[in-house]
Amino acid sequence: MRKSFFFLVLGISICWIQPVSAQLEPTNLSNAKSSTSSVYKRGERSWDGIGKYYLGREIAQVMSHQGAMWLDRPEREEEERSSVLWNNLNLSSTDVVADIGAGTGYHTFPLAKRVPQGKVLAVDIQQEMLDMMAERMKENNISNVELIRGSIWSPRLPENSVDLVLFVDVYHELSHPNEMMQNIVKSLTDDGVVVLVEYKMEDPAVPIKTLHKMTKAQCEKEMDAVGLKLKEYKNNLPWQHFLVFEKAN
């Protein structure tokens, strides 16, 4: 199983390209750029990075919709224990959950079953991904999922409306993480949380490209920069960190 996984990652690596987000730049850039440009630095570009650094970390290239097959690979549950991840969330039936970078809905639809009186806001910047999810919603008669096309700056969520914001192997690809997270914080209810699930940089055995992994310390550093503090950490996933953050104030 492990051997075939390496071949699959190599096969889709050409799909992790930055132009996916570049075409979604908003028109009112001047104010936003002037207020946050100092938090980013330009530097040497890695072959799977964008040459843009945030708090010492090079931002990774984005995985395009052409790599959607990898998101739904049959062995994913065995590799990542996704069902354990979902249990870790401790969702209530009425919760409003935002799945950022929802992709094909691999996490979105199982979560929707866990919040029958709530809803899942499935956010993606690629219309092709949203179209895939819309087709699945129609085929399976799913009514408590709302599709939202976000931007590279904002998930476009209503303020003070979300109980849990979930990033699964997505955060490290955000081209504007500071702006995105500031908007995420605005969307949280008073006791809302952000959950980061990221491949473990500390474990060299995790078969994922370096820029698509993060250390626990780096995750905490970047969340602290937008006013979030670590509430809980679980180490029960084989390849990934599971970190829960809440508002510091």
Give a label for each model feature.
Residues 231-249:
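Core SAM-dependent methyltransferase catalytic element
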Residues 98-154:
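Class I SAM-dependent methyltransferase SAM/SAH-binding core
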Residues 28-92, 96:
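Class I SAM-dependent transferase core
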Residues 178-193:
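A short glycine-rich, Lys/Arg-flanked "PGG" loop and its adjoining helix->strand segment in the class I
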Residues 155-164:
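A short acidic, Gly/Pro-enriched loop at the edge of an enzyme's catalytic core
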Residues 7-16:
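Bacterial N-terminal signal peptides
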Residues 163-177:
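A short SAM/SAH-binding and catalytic strip from SAM-dependent methyltransferases
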Residues 195-220:
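Conserved class I S-adenosyl-L-methionine
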